[in-house]
Amino acid sequence: CSRIHIRKLNGTREIFKMNYDTPTPDIRLYPAALLGKRYAVSCDINQFFPSIYTHALDWALIEKDQAKKNAQGKICQWSHDIDRFSQLCTNRQTHGLLIGPHASNLLSEIILARVDEALLMKNADYRFLHHIDDYTCYTESYEEAERFILDITEALRAYDLSLNEKKTSIAKLPTTLSTDWVRRLQLLRPQSKTIRLNDVVHYFDEAIGMTLELDNNCAIILYAMKVLAKLTEHMEYRAKLYYFEMSTHLLFLHPYLIPHAEQQVFQRGMNLLDITSFIPILYSQAIGQRDNLTCAYSCYFAAKYNGTLPSTLCDDALRSDDCLFKLFAYWFFKKKNDAGGVKALYDDALALSQNAEDFDSNWLFVYEALNVNDLDGKWKALK
């Protein structure tokens, strides 16, 4: 069964929640699944979201033989529409779902529910859980574990998916439920009412050490930042200052962490001057590395926190040919009342709107930058 429980949550628009800090009710499934079992199989679907074939959504919803007859929705219009709209999200590509939106998780569960069904039809006694693309099955014997790998490989192949062989393993029980580094960091979490400088230094040192041990797995640093971010109200001044300084240093070193900068660092009481000083440093590195996503975040941070960016920003954004970078650069210039920057990006958006393929690849930027009378049809009505 899936550990992604799609449901309406109170007080949020989210349809499920991923939280590594608080055990979910799903953890109670483990003892029942382990009873009488001697081996654990761990499997990971290879390049899961990028590999999802949008037509496979139609296959999963109405069966493959029916889906092949479902051109233009002749048999089932809504399943055909899900396939078609999924393609429109990726510039009409039939392979790949967007990574991040909860809608992608909902769509992927349509396929995985069929995979789960196929596994149970092969062996009704299989006891397995999956968390998005990570499967764990508990078996009585090594041979049964091997059969599970063969069965899930076959079930995935029916939807043009495959296992990542490097991440497929069979382990003898007992084994821990938490990843080793998670367990170690949970034990090291500062417990005192007042968090002192040495507590924060020690916790970061341990997290960085584990990261280096495990091939620069930045998820470890992110976990540590989330733990410490919740404790900033209990930190003495020097401890809090160290947390902000070390966190911005780690953000600079690991672009993977940038999407979490605001929630885990900036909004935890960081000095505004320190935030605005950090932004151009972050931007300069991102430009040098051609990291357009971090450039986009830099523009967002600069606009929101009234920071500054180099005078080359407009040329950088236009040269990048990146939708999000240009969008947030445009927003930055609007916030700063920079008529020159706004005009240059407006002209670029207008030029992109003249070609259907260019428009599809940059629709979000074009839609935001152009005036209502510059748009046609449904886009004009929507604006």
Where are these predicted regions, by residue range?
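Conserved polymerase palm-domain catalytic core
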Residues: P31-I132, Y138-E146, T194-K383
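Polymerase palm active-site segment centered on the conserved acidic dipeptide of motif C
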Residues: Y142-N198, H202
